[in-house]
Amino acid sequence: IANASHEKAKLMKAAVRFYQGDKIHFDKLMDSEVKQHSWMRSFSWAFSLPNPPQLHFSKWYFLDAVMEQSIHSRPFYEFGVWRASSFKYLMKVFKSGYGFDTFTGLPEDWDIGRGVEKAGSYSADGSVPIIEGGEFIVGTFEDTLPVFYSEPRPIASVINFDADLYSSTICALTYSKPVIDEHTILIFDEF
């Protein structure tokens, strides 16, 4: 792709066209160096399913669809809050939410396949949001989750795993088992 700053737009456009039945642009990208991009791998997997899932080409449309199917009387949990844009959006429907983050950025380097996001990327400069109905637990998951889950917690309606790193996501998932039941919706943002 000539201009890397337009890479994600081109990938998304090709995926939308593919989803609408025009496979030419997507197939061309699959024959290029962006074949290993995490989005391309995700799109390829989704398009290979016998019954492709409903796709939402916007984080906000996706969250709207999740909220329509969720139990609003339960809280949501979010692992990886950063600047709390998703958290604030979810609070439009839920009465309470728990957010977990260091607010100082990634705790370790993150290899994204085309480069590395350095430890400290996605920092909120230590600024913890103040949102009515929200409770924020500050620190690494390894340090905070054993303490947080040492007490009974309400079953989750939605859990948004947006920690980016596999190590952080698997830690959060492992500790969250007590708040997951058959009605809990799990969201896995890239990791």
Cite the ranges covered by each PLM segment.
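S-adenosylmethionine/decaboxylated-SAM
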Residues: 37-39, 43, 64, 68-191
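Short helix-capping/linker turns of helical repeat alpha-solenoids
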Residues: 4-6
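Short acidic/polar alpha-helix capping motifs at helix-coil junctions
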Residues: 27-31, 50-53, 141
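Alpha-helical repeat scaffolds
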Residues: 1-2, 23-35
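"A position-specific structural signal for the A-helix of alpha-solenoid helical repeats
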Residues: 8-16
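Conserved SAM-binding loop and adjacent beta-strand
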Residues: 48-61
